[in-house]
Every structure is written in C-alpha cells, then in structure tokens.
Amino acid sequence: MRIYETMFIIKPDIAEEEREKIANGVVEFLKEKLNAQIDNVDRWGIRKTAYPLKKYNEADYTVVYFRATGENLNELEMYFKVRPEFLRWQTFRRIDLEKKERKTAKKVETVENTEKVEE
C-alpha cells in the first residue's frame, strides 16, 4: 500500500458541527470506497487563505494521511468535485514517508538478526 496525503478546504460560512461532519464524511469515504487505512486526521480549523478562494478570505483546513492502493483515487477527486462545500483539495503520494518507513523496517530487521546471531 502507498501512503497519501489529502488536504481539503471547506467553506467557512458552514456551521462548525456541519464542517466536522463533512470532514468525517471524507474519512468514511476513504475507508469504505478506497479501502484506505487512515493514519492521521489533522483538523486545522479556520485559517486565513493566501489569496481569496471563491470570494472567501478564510477557510476550514483538514489534512488526512492514509494508505491505499491508489487504484481508485479518481473516485476521491469526483467526491470533492460534486460537493459545493469544498473550495480546494489536493492529494499527494508521500514517497518520502514510504522511504522512511522502509528504512525503519530494515533497521528493525537488522537489529533482530544481530540479536539472533549473538544468542
């Protein structure tokens, strides 16, 4: 499985509870439709935008880190496109985190092998 990061920005004029439901809906979509394993959900809340987005100067930011095969990522894109509450979204493959994870796994494996040799 590959590691991905998705950031999405929700309109600020929606009630806080509703924005929370929308963010949780994205997480549920990832789990159900993409069979993704969620590593972390980071809700930033309302922040100023770098420039106006559809006449909004601030928006609600959320970042989700997840693991998936990547086969159905276009479904995630469509999920965001058809819902007007999203101002922007972007999904990245996090190759740096994948490499870091592999490197850590190799170190653990090496330590285990060294311990077996010493016994």
From Swiss-Prot:
GO cellular component term of the entry, any: ribosome
Pfam families: Ribosomal_S6
GO biological process, one term: translation
Keyword terms, alphabetized: Ribonucleoprotein, Ribosomal protein, RNA-binding, rRNA-binding
Gene Ontology MF annotations: small ribosomal subunit rRNA binding; structural constituent of ribosome
Matches recorded under InterPro entries: Ribosomal_bS6 (IPR000529), Ribosomal_bS6_sf (IPR035980), Ribosomal_S6_plastid/chlpt (IPR020814), Transl_elong_EF1B/ribsomal_bS6 (IPR014717)
Superkingdom of origin: Bacteria
Entry similarity comment: Belongs to the bacterial ribosomal protein bS6 family.
Functional note: Binds together with bS18 to 16S ribosomal RNA.
The protein, known as: Small ribosomal subunit protein bS6
Species the sequence originates in: Thermosipho africanus (strain TCF52B)
Gene for this chain: rpsF
